[in-house]
């Protein structure tokens, strides 16, 4: 049941966030304008590890950051396959540090 997906997420949440960050591209325009923000993206990791139904849960308020966040999830796919499809919500931080 859901218990397995919970275990998968507990063990892999940091890995999932790191993997997405690896594929995150800060648009040069957003960088130039000093735009920063936090985006929450929701998606399902299917049993073969692919990201499906990727959607914006909470916007950063900037289209370019929102788009980059969604793209990063698609590029980071596939992830380590879960025992059952798992729905994930991941915060993606854009900061110019």
What positions do the PLM features span?
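Acidic/histidine-rich, surface-exposed loop or edge segments in extracytoplasmic proteins
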Residues: 1-6
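Short proline/glycine- and basic residue-enriched helix-capping loop/turn segments at helix->loop/beta transitions
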Residues: 8-41, 67-97
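Short, acidic, Ser/Thr-enriched surface-loop or helix-capping motifs
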Residues: 45-46
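A short acidic/small-residue loop/turn micro-motif
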Residues: 58-62
